[in-house]
Amino acid sequence: MKLKAMYSFLSDDLAAVEEELERAVQSEYGPLGEAALHLLQAGGKRIRPVFVLLAARFGQYDLERMKHVAVALELIHMASLVHDDVIDDADLRRGRPTIKAKWSNRFAMYTGDYLFARSLERMAELGNPRAHQVLAKTIVEVCRGEIEQIKDKYRFDQPLRTYLRRIRRKTALLIAASCQLGALAAGAPEPIVKRLYWFGHYVGMSFQITDDILDFTGTEEQLGKPAGSDLLQGNVTLPVLYALSDERVKAAIAAVGPETDVAEMAAVISAIKRTDAIERSYALSDRYLDKALHLLDGLPMNEARGLLRDLALYIGKRDY
C-alpha cells in the first residue's frame, strides 16, 4: 500500500497537526522561525506524528491533546536533522539547502536547540509529568546518539553492536516514543502502551537499516542528496560493516577518509554493492520488522492496528 493511501484515514488530523507545526516553529526572533519554517516546508513523511495518532486510537482519542504530542515528536526529529546536517557538513536536505548551508553552522545548532525547547514546551501542554519525562529522556538519548555518530566517524573497526546502539538512540527510540506517548496520552491500558513502545522500537530499527541501505541503492533524485552520502561523510552503516567481512573490498573501504574524493568514493560504493552486504542488511531489517509485526497480534483489533501493520511493512520494504 502506498503511503498516501495509508494516510487517507488520518488526512484531516494530519492537516491539523501540520498547521500546529507551523505555529510551533514561529519565533519572536524572526530568523529562528524563518530557519525552522525553511526545514518544515521541505516536507517529509511525518512518520512520527502518524504513529502518535494511530497509537492514540487504542485509548480515548482526543485530537486537541494528540496534536501536542504529534508536534512535540516531529520537532525532536526536525532538531536532530538540523544537528545531523552540521555534523555531516551536508548542503542538501530533501533536495533543498540545509539550514547550515543557507545560514551557518552556529545558526543551525541554535535552531536545533530551539526546536528541542519548543518540543518540551508543547508536551507540557498535556499536564502529564510522565509523558514529559519520557519526552525529555528521548531527547537525551537522541543527543547521545548524535555524539556517538561524531565519535564513530571513519571507525571501520567498530563492532555491529556499536552501530545497533547508535541507530537505536538516533532513530528507533524516537519512533518507540511516538507510539508510547500517543497511547499514554490517550489513556490506553499499560500493557498496550508497553506493546506499542516495543513495536515502535523494532519498526525504528528496521526503518534506519532500510534508510542506510537506500543510501547505496537509491538515486540522488529519490534521496534528495547524493547517493553514498553517508560513507562520504564518514558514517559507518550496516552495509559497510557487512562489506568489511569481504576481503576483496576490506582494504578499499578501510582506506576511506576525509580526503577521499567523489570519484574514489564512487568506486568503493560500487565495490560494496557487488558484495552480499545489501542482502544481509535487508535480512536483519526483516528480522526487526517480523518482531514488530508479531507484537501487533496482541493488540485489540481495530482499523489503527491494520494501518500500523501497513505502515510497518511500508517502512521496512520501501525502495526510496
Swiss-Prot record:
Binding site for Mg(2+) 1: 84, 88
Names of required cofactors: Mg(2+)
Disulfide bonds: none
EC number of the protein: 2.5.1.30
Keyword Magnesium attached: yes
Entry keyword annotation includes Metal-binding: yes
Positions with a binding annotation for all-trans-hexaprenyl diphosphate: 93, 170-171, 208
Binding site for Mg(2+) 2: 84, 88
GO terms of biological process kind: isoprenoid biosynthetic process; menaquinone biosynthetic process
Reactions listed under catalytic activity: 4 isopentenyl diphosphate + (2E,6E)-farnesyl diphosphate = all-trans-heptaprenyl diphosphate + 4 diphosphate
GO molecular function: heptaprenyl diphosphate synthase activity; metal ion binding; transferase activity, transferring alkyl or aryl (other than methyl) groups
Record text on cofactor binding: Binds 2 Mg(2+) ions per subunit.
InterPro entries in alphabetical order: GerC3_HepT, Isoprenoid_synthase_dom_sf, Polyprenyl_synt, Polyprenyl_synt_CS
A Pfam family recorded for this sequence: polyprenyl_synt
Keyword vocabulary terms for this entry: Isoprene biosynthesis, Magnesium, Metal-binding, Transferase
Lineage: superkingdom: Bacteria
SUPFAM superfamilies (alphabetical): Terpenoid synthases
Record note on quaternary structure: Heterodimer of component I and II.
Function: Supplies heptaprenyl diphosphate, the precursor for the side chain of the isoprenoid quinone menaquinone-7 (MQ-7).
Family membership: Belongs to the FPP/GGPP synthase family.
Protein name per Swiss-Prot or TrEMBL: Heptaprenyl diphosphate synthase component 2
Protein source organism: Geobacillus stearothermophilus (Bacillus stearothermophilus)
Lineage, broadest ranks: Bacteria, Bacillati, Bacillota, Bacilli, Bacillales
